[in-house]
Regions:
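Ligand-binding beta-strand-loop-alpha-helix segment within the catalytic cores
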Residues: 3-69, 84
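Gly/Ser/Thr-rich active-site loops/lids in small-molecule metabolic enzymes
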Residues: 12-19, 89-101, 118-131
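Internal active-site segments that recognize and position negatively charged phosphoryl groups
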Residues: 26, 57-109
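Polyanion-binding loop/helix "lid" in catalytic or ligand-binding cores
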Residues: 21-22, 29, 69, 73-75, ...
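Acidic, metal-binding active-site segment of PIN/NYN-like and related structure-specific nucleases
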Residues: 41, 91-116, 153-160
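Short, hinge-like loop/turn segments at secondary-structure boundaries
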Residues: 6-9, 57-60, 114-121, 172
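Alpha-helix C-terminal capping segments
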Residues: 20, 26-35, 88-96, 144-148
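Conserved small/polar residues in nucleotide/adenosyl-binding loops
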Residues: 166-171
Length: 178
C-alpha cells in the first residue's frame, strides 16, 4: 500500500505480495519435508511446477492423504489481503480453525510492539474484536470468520514449536490468544 502513495501500481504491488507468499510457502514446505513431514504447495495463481493450482477438492484430497497443504498467493486477486485469502481457504475446506502466525503471542488491546501498556486477551469474541477496532486481521477476514464460525488462534510464529501446539482447538466463538 505504501508504494501506491508514491505512484506505483497497486495491482502490481499486490501481485508482488502474492509471489512473496509463494516464496515463503516453498521455504516452509522445504523445512517440513526436511523434518520428514509430507507437504504440498498449492497456489491461487497458476505456476506449475512451482506449486499446484489450488482447488478445494485437491486440497482436501492431499490433507486426507496425510500431507500438510500450504496454500499460497492469497486469493489470487489484488486488493485482498493474505488474511482474507486464509479465511476464504479455511472456510472453503471446512477447517476446524484458522491459525494466524504473527510476531506477537496473541491478541492485545493495542500493538504490544508499540504500546508497552497493551493487555493480552485470552479469549475474545469476533464482535468484541470488531467493536474495539483491534487489528488482529483485516475487517473482511474477521467478518468472514465470524459469519462462518471459523475460530481464530493467534500465536507467535517465531517461537519454536508453536505451529505444532495449535492443532486441536476447543470450540469457541471468536479468537483466542495462547
Amino acid at each position: 500500500l505504501s508504494g501506491a502513495n508514491k505512484g506505483f501500481d497497486r495491482v502490481k504491488g499486490d501481485q508482488m505480495g502474492m509471489l512473496a507468499t509463494v516464496i515463503n510457502s516453498l521455504a516452509l514446505s522445504s523445512a517440513l519435508v526436511a523434518a520428514g513431514v509430507k507437504a504440498r504447495v498449492l497456489t491461487a495463481v497458476r505456476m506449475e511446477p512451482i506449486g499446484e493450482f489450488y482447488n478445494k477438492w485437491r486440497a482436501i484430497e492431499c490433507m486426507e492423504a496425510g500431507e500438510v497443504v500450504i496454500m499460497s498467493a492469497g486469493t489470487g486477486n489484488p486488493f485482498f489481503t493474505t488474511d482474507t485469502g486464509s479465511s476464504l481457504r479455511g472456510i472453503e475446506i471446512e477447517a476446524d480453525v484458522m491459525l494466524k502466525g504473527t510476531r506477537v503471542d496473541g491478541i492485545y488491546t493495542a500493538d504490544p510492539e508499540k504500546d508497552p501498556t497493551a493487555t493480552k486477551f485470552h479469549d475474545i469474541t469476533y464482535d468484541e474484536v470488531l467493536k474495539r477496532g483491534l487489528k488482529v486481521m483485516d475487517l473482511t477476514a474477521t467478518c468472514m470468520c465470524k459469519e462462518n464460525n471459523l475460530p481464530i488462534i493467534v500465536f507467535d510464529m517465531d517461537t519454536v514449536g508453536n505451529c505444532l501446539l495449535y492443532t486441536s482447538p476447543s470450540p469457541r466463538d471468536g479468537a483466542t490468544s495462547r
